[in-house]
Amino acid sequence: MTVQQRRRLPIASRETLQALLSEGAQALGVALSDAQRGALLDYVALLAKWNAVYNLTAIRDPRQMLIQHILDSLSIVPHLGAHGAAAAALDVGSGGGLPGVVLAIALPGWRVTLNDIVHKKSAFQNQAKAELKLGNLSVVTGRVETLRSGADVPAKFDVIVSRAFADLADFVTLARHLVAPGGSIWAMKGVRPDEEIGRLPDGACVKQMIRLTVPSLDAERHLIEVELDEAI
């Protein structure tokens, strides 16, 4: 059995997921090629296959993985597009590669770096990079506050994003030194994080808060863009 065969979901399941992905992406306004859709489904298959080994997600069902991980991550793509077709992004606390792997697939002109402190999760991220042939994806292990541009990472980032990393104020404090001029920090949240916003550090303010609608997901989702004085 080839690597390609091992990572594929059963045909019926894959067809069902493909329809769900196509409908969801269309509803979100995200254009995906056949190759991109295939890569996203291969990624779901990798998550499902290796979850028990790497402890990547509490979700076990591939359909729910597609909804709660893939479509949820795709929902931010139209909003991050304001940074252009060739931006550099850092995904902090990436875990199984979310949303960074999805961004690397959906935005092939972007350079995406995944960051986590857990080595086995970085190992899975590197495996996903290799199996999905994502040349625009990099992996760096370590605490984000210790990373230095020009050393641990090549340069500062236009976009720093997190899906489930920390309190918003802590996220901004720990990652702000890696934001490039003109860049910003984006936090994916569930319910509106008003208390967290109230604790933002000096020199940081909310530029916009977007209520997201994720297809097939009955849950609140918000995307918060934080602007920094030093990055303006």
From Swiss-Prot:
Subcellular location(s) of the protein: Cytoplasm
Keyword Cytoplasm among record annotations: yes
GO CC, alphabetical: cytosol
Keywords (A to Z) from UniProt: Cytoplasm, Methyltransferase, rRNA processing, S-adenosyl-L-methionine, Transferase
Catalytic activity: guanosine(527) in 16S rRNA + S-adenosyl-L-methionine = N(7)-methylguanosine(527) in 16S rRNA + S-adenosyl-L-homocysteine
Annotated EC: 2.1.1.170
Record carries keyword Methyltransferase: yes
UniProt-listed CDD domains: AdoMet_MTases (cd02440)
Pfam families found in the cross-reference section: GidB (PF02527)
Residues annotated to bind S-adenosyl-L-methionine: 93, 98, 144-145, 163
GO molecular function: rRNA (guanine-N7-)-methyltransferase activity
InterPro entries referenced in this protein's UniProt entry, alphabetically: rRNA_ssu_MeTfrase_G, SAM-dependent_MTases_sf
NCBIfam families linked: rsmG_gidB
Family under the similarity heading: Belongs to the methyltransferase superfamily. RNA methyltransferase RsmG family.
Function: Specifically methylates the N7 position of guanine in position 527 of 16S rRNA.
Protein name per the record: Ribosomal RNA small subunit methyltransferase G
Organism whose genome encodes this protein: Burkholderia pseudomallei (strain 668)
Lineage, opening ranks: Bacteria, Pseudomonadati, Pseudomonadota, Betaproteobacteria, Burkholderiales
